[in-house]
């Protein structure tokens, strides 16, 4: 009996010694009792499934015994590339039990992440597009190659997007809602604004790229880290099954306190071949203290003003890769029209849009894109900030690049296994990342919040006015000067039903979508 007791105590001591670290987040705003658990890289699918089964049993036992937390349990599961993990609401004893599993890498408190933009009243004209295609400030035209990002998909990981805004011309779709608020729209305006800069017909850089809305922040512009990691996971899987991660860009105009879990998720997305543009933050401090800006493999973007100075609010430091226009940027607002915003949130989508543009033009992908952007940029930023290793402002090199790509990639050719015409779609559950886009128009069916969005429908999604409400603590913005929109022939008086039937019915619809996703 004594020997058995000795062995038990020894095993307990070994388990405690090998327990995973439960990270502390003393300076962050945390979500009560919510945690993110990351498994080690060598965790197999069987190990992960076994851990989840064990967790369910342990959690149920602990809650039954103590009954201290309401609505507890696992919420998100992460499984892409080498990264496996999950998030959930657990009591302290359950977290200690989780950390004892030798397959667990670390446990991190769930923290609040916010957008890096702010609404400002301004009547200045939009200047960012002209600046990134001309060698000097003050130009009035945007010069670009007609390829304009065609064949590239941009994932807006943000507050959602008004996908029906006229500036997107039907190239934007709703993807996923990880906020689980049942509100599949952009109630703040932030995500619609950043998306307009990336792919809008009038406001955008990559004017022919597609866009997928991934909502990870609520209408107040904030959300938990666990949901953002889930949004990254969803985006990678959707890209992998719809054209490939090497033809995908992700923009993250958000950030918060340093998070190992968020940085790890961002790094895994880059490892899968995606390009990630991340806002540096608006605190006029070292960006190295925030996530995901501090992740070395992403392209971290500071903000510049019209005179090529660093914007007064922009973060700085060793994490900065590039600068882009971010002060007084006019772009799309929910419900139609435009508004002006400032922030590194506005700078990052300039980089994401230019990345999509270059990926289509030169065939590059992943981490090579950030290096190419640095090569094409101009060394013109003044007062880049303490410890900032670069003063490079992005530039498209004048339509064709201006400088030759030293390692041009071959033009992608269609796979011989792909049919020349899309096959008829088969019924499937809406919201799966790999669900193909239909060859014929069909009515959309409702999807559950938090699941990948539906394929392009044959009829437009029913629109409704969006509030475009200001961020907390800000006054409502005055409407920016309205730009003439002519997204369809005939202006405001054209026959929409006749236009839709003519251009989006029957065989024309099939041919359009055959090339759209291939």
Curated annotation (Swiss-Prot):
Domain of life: Eukaryota
Disordered: annotated segments: 175-198, 282-312, 378-496
Protein's UniProt keywords contain Glycoprotein: yes
Biased composition annotated in UniProt, kind: Pro residues: 405-470, 478-487
Alphabetical list of InterPro entries matching this protein: PCSK9_ProteinaseK-like, Peptidase_S8/S53_dom, Peptidase_S8/S53_dom_sf, Peptidase_S8_Ser-AS, Peptidase_S8_subtilisin-like, Peptidase_S8_subtilisin-rel, S8pro/Inhibitor_I9, S8pro/Inhibitor_I9_sf
Keywords associated with the record: Glycoprotein, Hydrolase, Protease, Secreted, Serine protease, Signal, Virulence, Zymogen
Primary localisation category: secreted
Maturation-removed propeptide residues: 20-116
Role noted for this protein: Secreted subtilisin-like serine protease with keratinolytic activity that contributes to pathogenicity.
Protein name: Subtilisin-like protease 1
Species this protein is from: Trichophyton verrucosum (strain HKI 0517)
Gene: SUB1
């Amino acid at each position: 009996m004594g020997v058995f007791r000795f062995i038990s105590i020894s095993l307990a001591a070994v388990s405690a010694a090998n327990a995973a670290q439960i990270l502390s987040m003393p300076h962050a705003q945390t979500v009560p009792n919510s945690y993110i658990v990351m498994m080690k890289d060598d965790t197999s699918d069987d190990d992960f499934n076994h851990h989840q089964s064990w967790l369910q049993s342990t959690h149920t036992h602990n809650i039954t015994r103590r009954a201290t937390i309401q609505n507890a349990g696992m919420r998100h599961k992460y499984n892409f590339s080498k990264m496996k993990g999950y998030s959930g609401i657990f009591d302290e004893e359950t977290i200690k039990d989780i950390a004892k599993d030798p397959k667990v890498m670390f446990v991190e408190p769930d923290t609040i992440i916010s957008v890096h933009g702010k609404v400002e009243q301004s009547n200045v004209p939009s200047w960012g597009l002209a600046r990134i295609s001309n060698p000097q400030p003050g130009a009035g035209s945007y010069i670009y190659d007609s390829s304009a990002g065609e064949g590239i998909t941009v994932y807006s990981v943000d507050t959602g997007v008004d996908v029906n805004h006229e500036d997107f011309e039907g190239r934007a779709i709703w993807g996923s809602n990880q906020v689980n608020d049942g509100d599949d729209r952009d109630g703040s305006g932030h995500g619609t604004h950043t998306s307009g800069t990336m792919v809008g017909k009038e406001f955008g850089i990559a004017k022919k790229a597609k866009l997928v809305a991934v909502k990870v922040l609520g209408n107040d512009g904030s959300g938990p880290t666990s949901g953002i990691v889930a949004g990254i996971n969803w985006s990678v899987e959707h890209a992998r099954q719809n054209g490939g991660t090497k033809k995908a860009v992700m923009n993250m105009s958000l950030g918060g306190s340093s998070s190992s879990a968020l940085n790890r998720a961002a790094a895994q997305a880059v490892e899968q071949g995606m390009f990630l543009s991340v806002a540096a933050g608006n605190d006029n401090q070292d960006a190295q203290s925030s996530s995901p800006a501090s992740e070395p493999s992403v392209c971290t973007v500071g903000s510049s003003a019209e005179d090529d100075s660093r914007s007064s609010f922009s973060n700085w430091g060793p994490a900065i890769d590039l600068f882009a226009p971010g002060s007084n940027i006019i772009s799309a607002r929910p419900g139609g029209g435009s508004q002006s915003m400032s922030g590194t949130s506005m700078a990052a989508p300039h980089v994401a849009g230019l990345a999509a543009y270059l990926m289509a033009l030169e065939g590059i992908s992943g981490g090579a894109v950030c290096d190419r952007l640095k090569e094409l940029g101009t060394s013109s930023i003044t007062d880049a900030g303490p410890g900032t290793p670069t003063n490079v402002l992005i530039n498209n090199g004048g339509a064709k690049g201006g400088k030759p790509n030293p390692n041009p990639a071959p033009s992608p050719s269609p796979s011989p296994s792909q049919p020349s015409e899309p096959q008829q779609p088969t019924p499937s559950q809406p919201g799966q990342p790999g669900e193909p886009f239909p060859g014929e128009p069909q009515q959309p069916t409702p999807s559950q919040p938090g699941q990948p969005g539906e394929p392009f429908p044959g009829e437009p999604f029913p629109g409704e006015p969006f509030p475009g409400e200001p961020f907390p603590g800000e006054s409502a913005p005055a409407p920016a000067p309205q730009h003439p929109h002519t997204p369809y022939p005939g202006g405001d008086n054209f026959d929409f039903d006749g236009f839709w039937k003519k251009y989006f019915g029957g065989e024309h619809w099939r041919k359009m979508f055959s090339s759209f996703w291939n």
